[in-house]
């Protein structure tokens, strides 16, 4: 069901969907229900807007399929807005601050506030990317900078000392950065050490495998292609399940800032 699965038009079965939306708390968005959004600057792309302030998030996530020569040459970002791009599949060419980046699967680009990024598909076949934007929260004496690389080059961290849960950190742990992007991977049977409750929000896109996720104390099956929004203080934890393939997702997290009152 849905454009990502190429099942649209006349139905041959009951209308059904695994999606769950609890505004400000959590949401599970599945490929079956996602629709295309027309966004100025995105040409020859299928773009879906995921988390937004309308859902209760302080950020915006996108899932974008770039067809041949598709991309955004107008510029993604803006004054006071930080952005992040991750290549799920394919090859793209991205530009920012006068530099050009050839990004393949696992490639990423972070642009600090005020720096626009452009990108275009670099192959005849479709490429798919995960995009993020958020209004930057400044702190006196510190500033972020442009960061690019590939997930394959990042240090593999044993999450909380567990050999079967691997964490990748995309951005420096510096006070200039008010957010980070990570990949968390669970071997089948592995899990978080405890159910978390914290002020940070997450937007998570599942890259591989299957899992069972606790969202506000509801245990919910999830799998590759699903998207999860977790609001501040929403209970959260997950298990990897299935046979062989790791349960992995890329996710954002706000950090390094006090709470304004």
Curated annotation (Swiss-Prot):
Names of the cofactor(s): Mn(2+)
Binding residues for Mn(2+): 196, 198, 202, 236
Record GO biological process: purine nucleobase metabolic process
Upregulating conditions: By glyoxylate and allantoin under anaerobic conditions.
A matching Pfam family: Cupin_2
EC top class named in words: hydrolase
Domain spans labelled Cupin type-2: 184-230
UniProt-annotated location(s): Cytoplasm
Catalytic activity as recorded in UniProt: (S)-2-ureidoglycine + H2O = (S)-ureidoglycolate + NH4(+)
Residues that bind substrate: 196, 236, 249, 253
Subunit details: Monomer.
Source superkingdom: Bacteria
Transmembrane regions listed in the UniProt entry: none
Chief site of localization: cytoplasm
InterPro entries named among the record's database cross-references: Cupin_2, RmlC-like_jellyroll, RmlC_Cupin_sf, UGHY, UGlyAH_cupin_C, UGlyAH_Cupin_dom, UGlyAH_cupin_N
Cofactor binding summary note: Also able to use Co(2+).
Described purpose of this protein according to its UniProt entry: Involved in the anaerobic nitrogen utilization via the assimilation of allantoin. Catalyzes the second stereospecific hydrolysis reaction (deamination) of the allantoin degradation pathway, producing S-ureidoglycolate and ammonia from S-ureidoglycine.
E.C. numbers: 3.5.3.26
Gene Ontology MF terms: manganese ion binding; ureidoglycine aminohydrolase activity
A GO CC term assigned to this protein in UniProt: cytoplasm
Entry protein name: (S)-ureidoglycine aminohydrolase
SUPFAM superfamilies assigned: RmlC-like cupins (SSF51182)
